[in-house]
């Protein structure tokens, strides 16, 4: 990668790690999961269930897109991936909130569970 791009990217990641609350806002997966990992990983979701993650300590970047555009699936997959990589504790409440994720209908009934299919990771 050209040095022309390296410094702006590094600056953006550093700003995201320092100001977690300004990335997405309270209650959003980006903010909650970055807090859960103490800012070691920078995350950002975009439109139609696009998610990116940057793990500077490992020099690793991830990008994913969920075809149907549903953020529930992208959040669950991202939590599964980050726990497999060892950067997110699966027992953390913010991870547990998203995987496995009970699906509650408007009457408050549990109608199922969102989980990763066997062999996905």
Where do the language-model regions lie?
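Structured C-terminal helix/loop/strand segments within mature extracytoplasmic catalytic/sensor domains
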Residues: 2-121
């Amino acid at each position: 990668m050209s040095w022309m791009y390296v410094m702006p990217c590094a600056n953006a990641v550093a700003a995201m790690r320092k100001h977690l609350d300004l990335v997405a806002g309270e209650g959003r997966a980006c903010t909650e999961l970055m807090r859960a990992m103490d800012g070691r990983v920078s995350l950002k979701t975009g439109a139609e269930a696009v998610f990116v993650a940057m793990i500077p300590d490992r020099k690793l970047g991830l990008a994913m897109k969920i075809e149907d555009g549903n953020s529930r699936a992208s959040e669950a997959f991202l939590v599964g991936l980050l726990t497999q990589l060892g950067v997110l504790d699966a027992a953390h409440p913010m991870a547990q909130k998203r995987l496995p994720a009970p699906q509650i209908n408007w009457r408050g009934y549990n109608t199922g569970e969102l989980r990763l299919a066997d062999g996905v990771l």
